[in-house]
Amino acid sequence: MEESMEEEEMLTYEAMMDDQNHNNWEAAVDSFRQPPPAPPLPPPPPPRPSSSIPDPGRELPGGQLLAVHAGSMDRKGLKEGLPMGSPPLSEPNGVIMMLKSCDAAAAVAKAAPAPTPSSTININTSTSKFLMNVITIEDYKSTYWPKLDGAIDQLLTQSPGDYIPISYEQIYSCVYKCVCQQHSEQMYSDLIKKITSHLERVSKELQASPPDLYIERFNIALGQYMGALQSIVPLFIYMNKFYIETKLNRDLKDDLIKLFTEHVAEKHIYSLMQWVQMAPTLFSKFIPNILPPAVESELSEYAAQDQKLQRELIQNGFTRGDQSRKRAGDELAYNSPSACASSRGYR
């Protein structure tokens, strides 16, 4: 009987020690999970002497359990007084700390200085700077196109070898900005109108020329215009690259040469016909359909005339080009008698 009592006492003591270790382990884990504890609460009231059973509303530390077991509890009280089941819930220190941290954050937000309007001013300033770079259609017509118009006038009316006091860099910059601001279509239209107006004026001047000066003035007008294109086309190369070639599938130089053909050459070709009758051999070198149709019996004479023309051109500085690039079939066709007849097909 005594042995069974001793065994029961030992089992009860081990259970109490397990509860103590379990409580200490949970407290250690909570100390790592939760923020620092709140200020210490006032000490609990002393235990009532009439009862040795702990208050179930609060959890006794492990040390108090040991003290109760060692001093004031007998074996029966130890068996009956220890609470069974899960330990009571601890005080919600995490919720209290969360509320206090929220209050502290609110206090810091109130104490922080109010944002100054400098950031808003900087944003507005950068936006205004960006808007200042925008070229409206009014800006194009009042500022940019007048510069281009004046430069085109000087280029179209210059004489060979004359110095033109214009800034090519400034003109190219104007074209670049207008293309970037989506004014390519308007600028191309203005350029075509400008050059068309100039060519119409040249055509009227040629019509008013006396017959003996007509050919000479026509040659001067053609040379002056082709020389102007050598400067105008490079100035508008950005518009040509990103508008004419991509959207119109054409080339600026071809368009400007076509303008001269339509407004000057085609209008005055018939004025040259009376001169053609005076020297048909001369004009047949440059104008087709001047000579009568070729005759087979005169093929050798046609070949001799072609060879003579080639010699004259070489003497005057004209070259036949790189003959090594000619295909063998073309060379045979050129040396055959039929080639001479075909070369006179425009007679």
From Swiss-Prot:
SUPFAM superfamilies: Cullin repeat-like
Disulfide bonds: none
One Pfam family per UniProt: Cullin
InterPro entries: CACUL1, Cullin_N, Cullin_repeat-like_dom_sf
GO MF: protein kinase binding; ubiquitin protein ligase binding
Subunit annotation: Interacts with CDK2.
PANTHER family named among the record's database cross-references: CDK2-ASSOCIATED AND CULLIN DOMAIN-CONTAINING PROTEIN 1
One of the GO BP terms on file: ubiquitin-dependent protein catabolic process
Protein function: Cell cycle associated protein capable of promoting cell proliferation through the activation of CDK2 at the G1/S phase transition.
Annotated region (Disordered), positions in chain: 1-63, 320-347
Keyword Nucleotide-binding: no
Biased composition (Acidic residues): 1-11
Keywords: Cell cycle
Family from the record: Belongs to the cullin family.
Name of this protein: CDK2-associated and cullin domain-containing protein 1
Organism name: Rattus norvegicus (Rat)
Coiled coil: none
